[in-house]
Structure formats: structure tokens, C-alpha cells
Amino acid sequence: MKASAFLLGGSLLLALGACDTTRQQTEGTSQSTAETVTSPTMAAMEKNGIRLTPFDDSPKYPEAQMRLKTPPSGATVPSGAVAFDYDLTNFVLTKMSSGMTGNEMAVSEKGQHIHNIVDNQPYTAHYTTEFTKNIADGQHVVLSFLSRSYHESLKHRGAYDLRVINVGSAPVQPLNADLSAAHMFYSRPKDTYSGNDTKKVMLDFYLVNTTLSPEGNKVRATINGSEFMLTEWLPYTMEGLPMGQN
């Protein structure tokens, strides 16, 4: 029987906050999403047998761009399956990504793809520029971003899209979402990991209109009750997770 670790978004908690680390809501001055990601300055952190290590050896694809053509921002679309259509430049879907650390973790055999997140729910991965996705009636915030084959997000400007759409013809309750404010979206880990994929598990999240620093916004990651303060917007490897649900 294969050993497996179950890693669900509800049990790994992330909170974005300003310099006062006792508060969990977003505070402080909003900043543009980082265009480049520098080499890690944070050291590995370890608590209660869980080790969290930033890494930055993945290919950057700085010229990769994504544009969501459909549905238009603010549009109202029919109930049911919503059609998405993207234009991509300098990024090849289904290609396998290089990167030493990333390829030590769970990898999609289908290659590079698009992550589509609705209302901060678990993402769906898509390997073509056109697809449909069932979305409930109402108003929704949709984040899309480019992803390497091992599910690490591209974090530069132009590699993501954030917009509000309306599904269905019935009157909707406005979300009053301020897309110019600072936002954080959870991405990885997701679902069930087995075999060698349990040894190192990626933690990745997406920031919009902000970045992280020791003096500014930080992310509090709570893993099995242990808190880690993250001051760099980078992917992290998690090691030492016990088998079972985390």
C-alpha cells in the first residue's frame, strides 16, 4: 500500500498581514505585484518537525504574457459552463518545465498549464487556451495565472489576470470587490500526495497589488498548528509532514 499525505487548503492556513504580525487582515500601502523575484534571503525554518524552505531556481520566463479575452471583465454570461479563452505569448502549454527543486515535487505529466481560481476556491488546471468551467450563478472573482509543470506560479506582471464576472441572468448580490486592493490567493498544496511526492511538498500562493518584506506585509502560514512568518513571495518546500490528513 502506498503511503499518502492528504493536504487540503482548509488545513493549511495562510493570512496576509502588515508589520503587526498579530493581525491577519490586509493592511498597509498596496504595492504593484512584483515584476521580478529575487534570490531567497530567508533561511529554512523548522518547527515541530516541519521544515519550510524557500527556493528560487525555477526558470523565470520573464517574457511570458497572458491575456484573458473571454469572458470580458464585468460581463454577464449564461448559467452553467462558462467559456474561457486566453491569448498566451512566450509560454508553451503542455511543455515540461526545468528546475531542480520544483521537479523534486509533484509534477503534472501534462506539463505547463493555466491555474484558474474562482473566489479563492481550489484551482482547476487547464492545458489549452480555450476551455469551459461550471461556475455557480452569481458574481465571482476569477484569478488566472501561468503555471510551471510542477504547479509553481509565474509571479511577474503580465502572467496573471484578475477580474469580476457575473454568471446567470438573475439579480446578483454585489461582492464589492476592490481589485486595486492587496489580495492573496491560495494555490498549493492541493489534493492527495503519495509515494515520493510526500517527501517534499510545495507551498505556493499568489499576491496581487502587494509584495512581502520584513518591514511590510507578511504571510503567516499555519501548518498543523505551527506558525511560520514568510517575508518573501517565493515558493516553499515543506518537509516532515506526517502521513494522513494535514
Task: Spell out what each predicted region is.
Residues A15-A18:
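C-terminal motif of bacterial Sec signal peptides marking the signal peptidase cleavage site
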Residues D20-T22:
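Bacterial signal peptide processing site
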Residues A34-S79, V167-G195:
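Short, compositionally biased P/S/T/A/G/V-rich stretches that sit at domain boundaries
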Residues V77-A83, S97-M100, G195-D204:
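Short coil/turn motif common to extracellular beta-sandwich-like domains
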Residues V82, Y86, A136-R148, F205, ...:
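Short, well-structured beta-strand segments within conserved domains
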Residues I114-N116, V219-A221:
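Short beta-strand elements bearing conserved aromatic residues within extracellular beta-rich modules
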Residues Q121-T128, S226-E232:
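Short beta-strand segments within Ig-like beta-sandwich modules, predominantly Fibronectin type-III
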Residues S147-K155, F228:
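Short acidic/polar inter-strand loop motif in beta-rich domains
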